[in-house]
Every structure is written in C-alpha cells, then in structure tokens.
Amino acid sequence: MFQDYLNDDTAEQWRWAGLYFDAKEYSQAADLLARVVERTPEQVGPRLLLARAYYHSAQLGRAEEQLREVIARDPVEQYAHLMLGRTLQRRGRPAEAARWLRLASALEGGGAPDA
C-alpha cells in the first residue's frame, strides 16, 4: 500500500494535500503533492493527484507532464489517459487529445467512441 512507502513527514504532507484538494485549494495541494512525488517517484497515486491539482489550477503544461509520466509508469491507468485527453483539449490540441480520449474509452471497456 502507498502509505507503507511514506515516512511520517511525507505521510503528513500526503494527508494535508488530500485535504487541500478536497477543499478545492488546488495550488496548495499541488505544492505538497510535488514534495510527496519527489520523495516517492515510483508511486502512481500521488503523481496522478498532482496532475489533477495542476489541471484544476490551470497549470496545464505541468499537468500534461505528470500525466505522461503516470502513463509511462502505468500504461493501463484509464483515468490518466482521460485526463491527458482533457488537458490537451484545454491546451488547444484537439487532434492529439482525441487519441488519448479513444484510449481512455477503450481501457474503460467502452470501445472507441465514434469520431
């Protein structure tokens, strides 16, 4: 389990980051999550939440970077594909986004959506 990888300080940052995220304080959550990811780079969960915090705080370049790293570490993480597609849409790259959204749909079991 993820918590097994954390020391007390990192666990506390993870806990607070979740509270900030739930309170829609995405920039504060991202600051803490970046530290957690730095200490536990092999863990996908904190990195995915960091990407979501970046997305919701309109730090789309950073969100894209983290989502690509999540997918590199866990190629079947459906939500990362979906979020990457949405991030690329918001960045004005609809053709590139479509590929990731199709993959997300396929991973979810819905097959590729009609174009």
Language-model segments: residues:
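Structural signature of tandem alpha-helical TPR/SEL1-like repeats
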Residues: 23-31, 57-69, 91-103
